[in-house]
Amino acid sequence: MVVEDALKTSASEDQAKTETNPKPREEDDEPEEGEIVGDEESASKPSKGIAPESHALEHSWTFWFDSPAAKSAKTKQEDWGSSIRPIYTFSTVEEFWSIYNNIRHPSKLAIGTDFHCFKYKIEPKWEDPVCANGGKWTVTLPKGKSDTSWLYTLLGMIGEQFDHGDEICGAVVNVRNRQEKISIWTKNAINEAAQLSIGKQWKGLLDYNETIGFIFHEDAMRHERSAKNKYVV
């Protein structure tokens, strides 16, 4: 509850700062897609020291970035995932907002970009041991309309708002030509009760009224785009 309140407070403070200082960042000063203003070493390690006023999260989380340019050079299926790179790991509410407020949101990312937020030491790949037996829930949104849903998904995960939060590996937003998709990856696909609980709670967090489906990673690897939903809510 303390962390959840801190997340809400930080969000309110951020909005207030925006309203009192509406001058936009100069174009030349904007970070590149996926770029974080800060030390590159922090991409692979959670912060060691937590200031007394900081609010520690239950888990450390890492943002990962997969750019269209990097993916275009990968033509073989076995190369899938090799272009994904970590950009920052955070362990507190304050670190999260510091990062989130200094990176481009989904609506500002190039078409073809995949942007991930996964628990520390879990890679956003089917081959990762923690993800291997899992699956994913996916919501589809109109082009340029995923920013709020992406933020609420992040806050729901890092704020431990899911009853089966231990099942969650992370989330990814996929920016495409005509639409954007957000997916939550989970660990144990055959745990139907846990997956259905996550799907229902996620829809509630997003106030999303369309039906969403859950696909096993194993089926996605075998059948790719023709993989069928195993669960729906």
From Swiss-Prot:
Tissue specificity note: Mostly expressed in leaves, flower buds, leaf buds and anthers, to a lower extent in roots, stems and green immature fruit, and, at low levels, in petals.
Disulfide bonds: C131-C169
Major localization class: nucleus
Post-translational modification note: According to the redox status, the Cys-131-Cys-169 disulfide bridge may have a role in regulating protein function by affecting its ability to bind capped mRNA.
Origin species: Prunus domestica (Garden plum)
InterPro entries: TIF_eIF4e-like, TIF_eIF_4E, TIF_eIF_4E_CS
List of residues binding mRNA: 76-81, 108, 126-127, 176-181, 221-225
Cellular component per GO, a single term: nucleus
UniProt entry keywords in alphabetical sequence: Cytoplasm, Disulfide bond, Initiation factor, Nucleus, Protein biosynthesis, RNA-binding, Translation regulation
Region (EIF4G-binding): 55-58, 65-104, 152-161
Protein name per UniProt: Eukaryotic translation initiation factor 4E-1
Cellular compartment(s): Nucleus; Cytoplasm
Listed Acidic residues bias regions: 27-41
